[in-house]
């Protein structure tokens, strides 16, 4: 057996946390104990970790001091962040965290900031010769409507999202052909459609936020999950997003898509990212790069986050990682489902804040 590990896992209430915790614990090589943090006292992962703590949100001034307090108390071997909102603050404070003798699985601050701003990311990739969807940055309502016409509206659908957002917050599709009665009676209440007149009315008397306005892309949604070291892709897998519920992907299929992997490799090289990176495509086009872990499709003999830990700790070579490519089971279906648990008395973890 290899030396045991203590991992500090952030955002243990995120959708992918339960499966990751189970897979990392059942790695077959070593014992792993978990320190889990989240801002939500009802975070699902609190029931699965060994040492749970509530911390402030990542944008709170007390987040990093609270994180450092947990580290000083628990002395983990590795800090493994999961949320987009956390990787930036953690990366900017990486030196301070590492001074407490903990390895940090996070990219450098500059590429993280680039990826977390959708417009800046597209501008950077385009300037380095990578293909992007057609997009604009309108500064006011008039420009927004004019840019929509340049994208083919109203004959073609367009979509927009904030430059900086998390998940699908702020994303909408503008389609003049949508039927409001159909949306009301037949569609789920969290649909993403809006009409142009509704958008104009919404921002008629207030400043227009920073939106990325872009062509609406057709085709299947695919994700490349990568393990990267200073921009070099060491291992990658591709999955589809077959079905979703409440905006959350529930069914995936593992695919052999060398074209998407090739694009992802070029983007990783230009950005200089590290560790687990999630690259999203719609059809043939890039739509997003998340500088963090995503929902993985696991195999018993291929657990990407565990391999990432081994790379971080210097326990595996590039050649050994590359050999895992032959293990990928193309066509494999992964199904996510809801689980529940009950407790007689809710155990509220410790709250550590800056004093």
State each model region's role.
Residues 1-37, 72-82, 137, 182-186, ...:
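Preference for protein termini
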Residues 1-106, 145:
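ATP-binding N-terminal substructure of ATP-dependent carboxylate-amine bond-forming enzymes
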